Amino acid sequence: MRPAPPPPLLLLLLLLPPPSLSHDGTIIAATSPTSGQPSTELPGGKGLITTAKTIQNTDLAITGEKVMSATVSKGPLPGSSNSVSMTLAPTQKNTVIAPDQDEKVSTNPTIATSDSKGIPDLNKSILPSATNSMKPDTPVTQTAGPGAQGNPGTTVSHMTSENTEQTTSQPPPQVKPSSITPALTSIITPTSPRQPSANSTTLKPPESSSESPDKSHTASSSLGTKVVPSSSLYGTSPTRTSSVTFWGGPQSSSGTPPVPAPTPRPAATSSSTPGISSVPGTTSLPSETESLESPSSESPSQPPKLRPTGPPSSGSSGPAASLPDEGPRSSSTQRAATAPRAPSVPSPTSAQGDDRIKCESPGRLTDKMLLLNLTRSGLCAGNNSDDKLITLLCRAAKATFNPAQDQCHIRLVPIQDTQAVAIKEITVQTNLLPRDVYELLKDKWDELKEVGVSNMKLGDQGPPEETEDRFSMPLIITIVCMASFLLLVAALYGCCHQRLSQRKDQQRLTEELQTVENGYHDNPTLEVMETSSEMQEKKVVNLNGELGDSWIVPLDNLAKDDLDEEEDTHL
């Protein structure tokens, strides 16, 4: 039997946002299972909205690994302010909630069905129930009916007040379907993506079974409410815990089964979407456009997924529940995948070899070329690793070639049909530091001054004449002057001393001559010798006779002879 197509009322429910978005923030989750007519506004003209329509004996099953259904509506009620009620229900295997038949106020959550392996069961039905708005400070209890299979169900207790909301989750038993009607096998696919609104509900697919549990999602909102944690069951064990964080008193549910206990979380740590404005008294959550994929385009083992197609809304004032999805990859993995890779840098050896040798197009041999016949493969054949040959060629161009300071470029022309190469040009580029240039220019400072250079300075060092001639030239001049003065003084002293000594000698001789001329002298023998000429003659004769053949004269003989002669003379 072919399933019935979805009615247009459900399309309006999922595609069009409800009106009356600028009221005081009261949320109404309402569905009517018994009447086939669409719900209308309540008396008073305030725009009270019901967010679900009913289908007699047919239901819509949104399948997936885990689908969180949330029914959120907004409308003003007299005497109520900032009261929020959200119905969040996880998916379970073979679980159906029977509708409320007496059209009374019912707050049973809507539960989608899926098997324990995550494959959706399209033969299970979901019967929505009618829910009216709740007044402030009114506790409402939502309970899933008991089942026969023993799987845990869900019991959700909402305590709604002006600024607080607490949600506890307890494990209920699984419920068997009592009357299962044929479900809709076709999944609603919107024809055009609608724009995100404040009251839209975003349903996200869960992670796969390989993802680790205890993951929580937090959506930021404005001031006035608290955390609504909800536990989700995947088979028999929960896979993750979704939480909606409101601004007033932030709380988040932990992922420890079976009952997640709300723990306080600072509002600053909640993951917020940029561009969302918050207004006190209302809730503002990022909402996205729902995009439902048809399961016919996928394999039966892969459940349909709901993917967001629109950007988050900004400036929304009405409440909107958003259950964000976390992709299979973490943010660090995505950043690593999208990070640009740096280009591979060639090694210094290969880059240097390619830079030093440049081979031009082959040419013919001429007499003016400098040829090098290579026994091994030529330099132009790709063998640029012969650094010794390159160094020898560069040192031939510059004797003081230093590979660490100089860069050598050789242009070669390979010869056809031979391993010979012709050297066309060798260029050596020297990279000098400023201090090396200063040391070289110091010796040529005079030439620099002639060409118009007036000053040269490197740090504290200036031109060479300021550092060297400042003390050397005056010192040299002083030394020369002192030496000349000392030589002059020595010459004057020598001349004066010589003249004084000559004067003394001349004066003494003059005095002696004057005494001899006057007949007065101190030598008595001189007078005897001068007066006795005979004795002098005798001495001469005696000396000549005795000393004729020899210059040696005995003193004793001379003394005796002299004494005898004197005695004879006196007699």
UniProtKB/Swiss-Prot annotation:
It is a single-pass type I membrane protein. GO terms for biological process: cell adhesion; cell migration; epithelial tube formation; negative regulation of cell adhesion; negative regulation of cell-cell adhesion; podocyte development; positive regulation of cell migration; positive regulation of cell-cell adhesion mediated by integrin. Disulfide bonds: none annotated. It is found in: Apical cell membrane; Membrane raft; Cell projection, Lamellipodium; Cell projection, Filopodium. Residues 496-571 are cytoplasmic. Involved in the regulation of both adhesion and cell morphology and cancer progression. Functions as an anti-adhesive molecule that maintains an open filtration pathway between neighboring foot processes in the podocyte by charge repulsion. Acts as a pro-adhesive molecule, enhancing the adherence of cells to immobilized ligands, increasing the rate of migration and cell-cell contacts in an integrin-dependent manner. Induces the formation of apical actin-dependent microvilli. Belongs to the podocalyxin family. This is Podocalyxin. It comes from Canis lupus familiaris (Dog). The gene is PODXL.
